[in-house]
UniProtKB/Swiss-Prot annotation:
SUPFAM superfamilies in alphabetical order: P-loop containing nucleoside triphosphate hydrolases
GO process annotations (BP): pyrimidine nucleotide metabolic process
Lineage: Bacteria, Bacillati, Mycoplasmatota, Mycoplasmoidales, Metamycoplasmataceae
One Gene Ontology cellular component annotation held by this UniProt entry: cytoplasm
The enzyme's E.C. designation: 2.7.4.25
Major localisation: cytoplasm
Protein name, as recorded: Cytidylate kinase
Length: 221
């Protein structure tokens, strides 16, 4: 194994992007970046500073007053404070979903990720616009997908394991609605790039998906 590369994993909701990316990062000893955490950190800052996250310009102005950092242990820092656990709060998650829709904020996050990944190789990242927006120059691009039914079933099982009441039909409807929204959003709609390798995990287990990506990565090192 020689030089490290950067890996981008894209795909629809419920495809297991984050779980797979984290496991691949461990096997390759890469740094895992979750773009969603950056949006959550911005949302948390807006809440803490009393900024109206329903107003794009207010959130954008706030960005000049904050500093976000990541480390190799998947921790995210807001103004020097480790907020990795705090950003998991439901209130923060809801605010982040709103903030992530704003073009100005998305542009800020793109620049943030570009600066990190230009410093060195050995990063793996997931997200619904990673292959074409956040890491367009990644040496390995993966579009991880699966049928809505399989993705909904996996998500329902995950929720059940976490102790949440889950209705499969409700989850399936949510997955299909999210797919439509992601594919038709005005800014950076979800799509498969020409240089991405599609992995359909419908008939694959977790280990098979991870091993496939690790193998593809090693071919490019």
């Amino acid at each position: 194994m020689s030089n490290k590369i950067n890996i981008a994993i894209d795909g629809p909701c419920g495809a297991g992007k984050s779980t797979v990316a984290k496991e691949v990062s461990k096997k390759l000893k890469y740094v895992f970046i979750n773009s969603g955490s950056v949006y959550r950190a911005i949302a948390l800052s807006a809440i803490q500073m009393g900024v109206d996250f329903e107003v794009e310009n207010e959130v954008f102005k706030m960005l000049s007053e904050i500093e976000i950092d990541l480390d190799e242990h998947e921790n995210i820092f807001l103004n020097g404070e480790n907020v990795s656990e705090t950003i998991r709060d439901d209130k923060v998650a809801k605010a982040a979903s709103k903030v992530a829709q704003y073009p100005l904020i998305r542009h800020y996050v793109v620049d943030f990720i570009h600066k990190i990944t230009k410093k060195s190789k050995g990063y793996i990242m997931d997200g619904r616009d990673t292959t074409f927006k956040l890491m367009p120059h990644a040496e390995l691009k993966i579009f991880l997908t699966g049928t809505p039914e399989v993705r909904a079933r996996r998500r329902a099982l995950e929720n059940k394991d976490k102790g949440f009441e889950t209705n499969y039909d409700v989850v399936l409807a949510e997955v299909k609605a999210r797919d439509y929204a992601d594919q038709h959003r005005e800014t950076d709609p979800l799509h498969i790039t020409d240089d991405a390798i599609v992995i359909d995990s419908t008939d694959m287990n977790f280990e098979q998906v991870v091993d496939k990506i690790v193998s593809l990565a090693k071919e490019r090192m």
